Amino acid sequence: FFQAEDGIRDRDVTGVQTCALPIYLVDAMWASENNTIKFADVPKSGVTVLRGKTLDGFGKYYKQTVKESTAPEVDVVAELKAAKVEVLICYLPVGSEEAAKFYAQCAIDAGCAFVNALPVFIASDKEWADKFTKAGLPIVGDDIKSQVGATITHRIMAKLFQDRGVHLDRTYQLNVGGNMDFKNMLERDRLESKKISKTNSVTSQLDYDLGDKNVHIGPSDYIQWLDDRKWAYVRLEGRAFGDVPLNLEYKLEVWDSPNSAGVIIDALRCAKIGLDRKIGGPLLSPSSYFMKTPPVQYTDEQAHDKTEEFIAGKLER
């Protein structure tokens, strides 16, 4: 996180990549494989990256690219309490099932609100939702949407087909990128929940089942020279009036990390609102607006309106 003027401040960050830990966050931002576009000068704030638990967070392609830190692991709960962290954001590599749940439990033990940006089902899992409800701590999740990304545009176009009376027969979404997220996703065994999350996010906007063979959505390949850019190729094939074929195909080009950052900041703000209001459990409206796999799926228009009502205090969650 960047230190900002609106009250969002850096706290301790945990990490496992190559650079020697602890390291100042402002230096870690450009270390090793971090290759996004620079859009701001970030002053040194004294915030350091500390050595967290790895568990299943370090996949095959990470091991081939960077060395895991040899620094001793910190007591995550103790560090969260010492830094007086109010909201913990989970932004681990795709496939970090065990690690994501470890940090979710750390949030509960440290008394933090939790924002789950990963396609690991926590907010949308009843057992975990009940844990946060019992602890009186809010959670926003699961699996962050980008500001304008492949999933949000694909959802809207699928819904547009249905709203305009065009029967969607089949669709695909192919994504390529050059950051470590895409390199990590070459390990297909880590993608099960990611594919489920992205697919269900799109198909949830339809009131009929396309069938598994007619939907293909997921990361496709790693192209190193793209750096932090992501290119998405989306196609929708349908039938309009008189069963006449109607097809739509488009390409989306974005810088992946900033496209996500603007959304995660608002998710953090909503989590803090929930914490201030002493709301425990999943925040349904912000989760549906900011996440691909929320506990409850609304249309994007409904989710936006409900989130505004939540912020204004007109809706509990």
Placement of each model-derived feature along the sequence:
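Active-site-lining helix/loop region of Rossmann-like oxidoreductase modules
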Residues: 148-280, 284
